A protein has these predicted regions:
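N-terminal helix-rich module
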Residues: 13-139
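N-terminal signal-anchor/signal peptide hydrophobic helix marking the start
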Residues: 1-9
Length: 139
């Protein structure tokens, strides 16, 4: 009887270890969307702190950040605002547009609300940018 209990205990421990290591199929795209959302929110906050317009440009290949300087958009190169490519196999949809720029003014308000769909391995998540500047990832 004790041997049977020991075997059941070992099987339970082994199955718990397997469950803890299995990743959800949507975890990769969700992680990428969360990273992107955090960087967009940081850009919005930076626009407020620096009291200047800043923008994120989203392309099929990735995204980059810019600041308004003397009437022109200038790419940012300091972390965390470096240009970033999407993971291999990731695609984005932006309201039918091929490329999109969303600018934040000095109060943190975006130039437009946007829903950006990020897809990878047949799993999609949406980054919702509200007219108030709120940035969140929704399923």
């Amino acid at each position: 009887m004790v041997e049977l209990m020991v075997v059941i205990f070992i099987i339970g421990i082994a199955s718990a270890a397997v469950v803890m290591t299995v990743r959800s199929p949507d975890r990769g795209v969700r992680d990428e969307a969360e990273r992107f959302a955090a960087r967009v929110a940081a850009l919005r906050d930076n626009a407020i702190v620096q009291s200047r317009s800043m923008a994120v440009t989203i392309r099929p290949s990735g995204y980059g950040f810019e600041r308004r300087d003397n009437g022109a958009w200038v790419p940012l190169s300091e972390a965390p605002f470096t240009s970033t490519d999407w993971q291999r196999g990731t695609s984005v949809q932006m309201s039918g547009a091929r490329q999109m720029r969303v600018a934040f003014d000095s109060t943190g308000m975006p130039s437009s609300a946007a829903n950006i769909i990020i897809k990878h391995d047949n799993v999609a998540v949406t980054l919702a940018l509200a007219a108030t500047g709120d940035v969140r990832v929704v399923r």
